[in-house]
Structure formats: structure tokens, C-alpha cells
Amino acid sequence: MNGRLLEGIRFFTRETEILSALCVACGAGGRTETAADGDAADRSVFDLASATKLFTGLSIMKLKEDGLLDFSRPVSYYDPRFTALRDVPVWDLMAFAVTVRTPVRLDACPDRDSALAALFASEAMPTAGRRAYSDIPAMILKYVAEAAAGTTMAELVRKTVLEPAGMTETWAKVPEERLADCQRYDREHRIENGKYILRAGLRPGVPHDPKAAVLQGDTGDLCGHAGLFSTLPDMIRFCRAVLERKIVGEESLREMAVNRTGRPLEDGTHTQYLGLQCYVRHPVQYWSEIPVYMGREAFGIGGFTGNHVSVDPARGLFTVFLGNRVLNRLTVLLPEEGKTLTDYGLRADGSGYFRWPDGEVIPSSVKYVHQKDAHLHRAVAETLGLPEVSMEQ
């Protein structure tokens, strides 16, 4: 176990208790370093959450390579149930080029059938403002990919990603005998504009993401945006396979990593920098999902549950964080008007402890995403001896 990585990990698992478990792997060339702390082991099964989109994106790029999917064709060409997307090319969903909305919130639907009906009624409109990232495109791309491949999304991911990578511990439906190894994402606490929300009773093997919980549950019918579960050893295999071009070729990797959405705004801020179902380097590191030691051809993504995956094919680098920021944690705090995080007793960076109305004191993982650079990515860079990569390179 690497000591420098462990030092970075323990900031989250012990010093602040932001995470109940965290395991890390990083690699350069033929070298791989790992460390873990808290309730984490090699057999631990983590909910990948939005990191699932990397599998969706790579599977779809493979269909394109094989001539089975044409990005210029409209979504409804592949699945006529998307009647309002007759003029929206598949490319627009892959590249976050449009905003897609459902008539009602999918996580508010009472059952799978009503959620599917809402998804099939999705409409697209021009993207406005800073944010372009959304789960809905990947949820629709699932059905596009299934139609093009003539199989289920779970089977497509198995054939195009898991088998080439030699991954045997990644599932849309966790085997019964491995449910005991699943991280628990129960008792999530949220405060949204004065409303106190406790989400309890989530079973192991059911995706934490509320939309995936409704649509996928424990059926194994993989959603495109979330729903995969994996272990650290398997995610190392995934990253190695991407770097070794075992899943898709050089051209596809380069295409995924091109900035499709990012640009400066008049107020001095930027829109999000996104590639094809992934993030790419942002010029302002605070907003970048991609670490400073990776370059313009790198891509990656985070997952709400406490995960991060990034790869730099040009430099032969990868980083994986699998963590749990949900279990009995305050994950979201949207302050009431005129208030800040400190008014709730937290530090300005979102860490600290909060006393719930029932008297229980719980750790906060609010704004965890912005703490990764200082404590995890810095440890990775020092471990592997990686310099900062200028955006000019």
C-alpha cells in the first residue's frame, strides 16, 4: 500500500470523515500504485454512479467503429418511441450539444413504466447558461445503442468493454453472493432550501442514483447514465484496457477527448468543458474534473457517490478513486437565500459536522468534489512524479 496515497486518503476517511471508505489506484507506464482506508478492500463493490457514462460512451464509440451506428442519424431512426427527437442527431446527445428535458422529473415517477413514458417523451432545446452536463442524453443513448447493436445495454457493455478488458467484477446486477461486499449508500442526508431530506432504506445492489433506482432497480437492465457496480481491481483493468486501445482505437479516444461545449462567457466565467459523454480539461482547475497532471487528450468523469476516473491515453496515465460519500453523510446543502455554508456550522469548503433535527451529528461531504485536487490528485502526482501539464501543451 502506497504511503503517500494513504496520507491523502486519510484526510477524507479520518481527518474530516468526508468519506466512510476510499480506495485509490493510479498508474503511469507499467507502474500501478494503490491504497485504501475506511470500510474498503479489494473485494469491496462500489456504485460507479455517473462513471457508468464512460462505459456507455466507449460502447457507442465501438458501435460507430464497427459501422453499426451513424451519429448523423436522428435518435428516432433507431428508436421511434422518441417521437419528439425526430430532428435530433445522435451526435447531439453524445456531445451534450442540446439540453434534453422530460415532461416530469424521472425520480418523481412512482414506477418504472411511468418513468419510461416520461423518458420517451423527452424534448430537446438549445443549451443556455454555464451548465451543459446532464444524465438524460446517456439515458436515451442506451436505447439508441440497444437498437443499433440488437442486444441489451448490459450485454453490449459486456462484449465491448468488460470482456476485452478482462473485467470479471463489474455488473449491472450484482450477483447474490457479492451483495455482502457492496458498499452501503443508506441514510443520505440533504438540505435543500430549508427542506430536510433523509433518504433511507436503499438496498445493496440498487443504484444510488434516484433515476436509475426507478428504471433499473436490481433488475440488471442497465441505464446509460448510471447503474454499474465495480471493484478497484476491475477498474484498474478498465483503465489499462483503455490506455492499451483494447476497447476502442486511437481515433475514437481522441474524438472523445475533444472539448465540445466549453467556452468563456462575458462575465469572465466559462461553460462546462465536456467531450463525448465525459469531461475534458477545464482552463480553470477549480472547475476541472480532469487533474492538472493530465493533458488535452485526457478525459474522465466523477460519480456522485464519491468516485472519479480519468485517463490520459497520450501520456499513458490513469487515476481511479472509489469512495463512499453517502453513507450517513450530509451530501447536499443548498442554503436558503442570504445564507452560506458557514451559517449551518460547516466550514466554507463544505467539510465539518451538522446536527440533524433529531440530534444526530453527521459528517458533511458537501463540495467533496472540490477537495480532490489538494488531497488526492496532489498525492497521485507526487507518487508518480508527474508535473503539472499546461493547457498550452
Predicted segments with their positions:
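Residue-level preference for non-acidic, small/hydrophobic
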Residues: 9, 24, 56, 60, ...
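Short active-site loop at a secondary-structure junction
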Residues: 16-23, 38-93, 123-136, 223-226
